[in-house]
Structure formats: C-alpha cells, structure tokens
C-alpha cells in the first residue's frame, strides 16, 4: 500500500473496523441511506450521521526523532488523552512521520497542535487535512 499514509488512506482493522462508524471514518459517503432496504445498524448510523460523530479520523504530521508511530499511541492535548493513533509510520515521499488516529470531533480542525506519545516520550504533532501526496486525487491509478 504505497503512499497510503501520504494519501491519508485507512486500512482494514486499523482505521476501518467494527469499533468505528462510517461517519467517524469519513466513509459515510459510501453508505446508501436513501435505499428502502434495511441493514443491521442502519438506525444507529443514521442517528450518528444526523447528530454528528463524537470522534473523527484525522491525520497528523509528527515531529518524531528516531522512532515513528506504529499504532495505539495516545494522543494528548495538554494533560488529557483525547484519542489514540490507529496507524502511522514514515511517509517517504514527503520525508515526514505521519499518524492516523481518532480525536473528538470538537477538536478535529486543521492546525490543531497535539502531542503523540512515542515510547514514553510526548512528541509534538499537527493535525493536517490536506493529503501530503496528490491532494486533488488526479494521480489515482485506473
């Protein structure tokens, strides 16, 4: 999955798993709520969509030193853990450490400064909304 982190693409059982709803992960646009057919969880998904998700999947550029995030690292705002990293690593195209993780929707805005704990040390990170590679999606493979 080359350039996955640079494109902010999630992966199954990391960003996309039964613990997270479609509104939280940004996959809501793929759910056909308008169809008459029922599916398990439709009423809950509709309620979350209408009320807005409690948390959102976000991308962070991390000021890592010699170790990158891997997954399950806490995301701190001041002295409070507000979320956890779902996956991350070194983005070779931009030469930056990138993390994907969930934070409360109220905090999910570009430029948010957080800290991500890596091996017991908190490292500064910035929430980014624009993919680091091909933000317009023009280089997507056919």
Language-model regions, residue ranges each:
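Conserved, structured C-terminal
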Residues: 1-142
